[in-house]
Amino acid sequence: MYSDRRHTRKRQRLLVVGVFLVLLLLALAGVLFALSNSSDSAKKETDNASNKEAKADKKDSSGNSGGEPGKKNNGAKKSESDKSGSNVKLGDKPEAVKGIYMSAYTVGGNLDAYLDFTDSTEINAMVIDVKDVTGEVMYPSEVPLANEIGATREVLPDLKTLTKQLDDRGVYSIARIAVFEDDILPRERPDLAPTDSSTGEPWLNDAGQAWSDGYNKKVWEYNVAIAKEAAEAGFDEVQFDYIRFPSDGPLDTLEYKKTPFPNDQTALGEFLKYADKELEPTGARIAADVFGLAATEDGAGVGQYMNKLAPHLDVVNPMTYPSHYPIGSFGYDNPNAQPYEMVRESMKDFEEDTEKVNPDIEIRPWIQDFDLGDPPYGPAEIQAQMQAVYDSNETGWLLWNPSNVYTEGALKPADSNEPTTAEETTTQ
């Protein structure tokens, strides 16, 4: 009996020791697992940091630091906190976007020369026609309606190839899409166009150009589908032009089939709201071209009210060409002779109009690099407009010349370290 109890106690002690050893081994295994995860996590963080640095180096071919607004600067991103409530796009972009307009035909035939131009000057962005006011879609789009109406062309190379070319050279890519002025869609699909009440045919402006119906959601879907193709192909930004209602022509005979919104500005705002939602997954920024007087004259008569448009935009592009302002604008008899004043006064109004509805919006104006009226425009007039932008606490601008011939003498060289902010410069 005593021997049995002794063997029982021995077995109990062995069991306790065995359990202790098992627990000890499990604890050691847990420590080793934690150390392994910590090492892997640290390695991933190091690899991610290295990848980000490599990407930044690729985008910043000029070698400038992140805070310098020089050429090809990767720059700061917009705040992740968008006070307007819409999603902010977080793709790489230069600290200061300084771009030129490029027709699809120029890109299709002479892109390399313009890429060299960006290498030698402060230009770091291109605005490229993807769909223009003729209604032509400048690449072989897969959007069904574009093919149904015969709008597609093969002017541009494959969009993915094009955006890779631009990205490899550190050029920020912007796809320009003319929305409601469109000479193909209304003629092929009159049900998607306003009607001329005197003829029963699609309404035409003074230039004989047709317009699509800005109230019609099928028209919205068509243009946004093209925008999505461009964004998914790699364009950094989508710029909607002719995001307005007609301004010239026999407006008294202009009739819409349905007007499901209380006014034109609400329709435009709802279009941009829809575009913002559809494009959000692509990460592309959304921009819109507007009249230079849109903020000064409450929509400029075409529905471009900033309180409706700005909440759904990352960028607004006022077309502040001094030659386009009517006599007497801001008190000047010859606006074309006041390049600084026209841009500066317009920028003030846009800042005031957007502050309450989207204080984070970038105001990046189109400025004039062409001759129309007196005086002709050279480096001094172009630089005066740029200075007006800097004095408005903005850093980016876009040069417009319909022939894509730009005044190199107005531009800084690519390696220039000259200041371009209001705090560091003086007004001309």
Give the positions of each predicted feature.
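Aromatic-lined carbohydrate-recognition surfaces of secreted/lumenal glycan-active proteins
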Residues: Y172-A178, D182, Q239, P262-V302, ...
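Substrate-binding cleft of secreted/luminal carbohydrate-active enzymes
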Residues: S36-N37, L313-I327, N336-R344, D349-Q428
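Active-site-adjacent "subsite" loops/lids of carbohydrate-active enzymes
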Residues: L90-M102, F180-E229
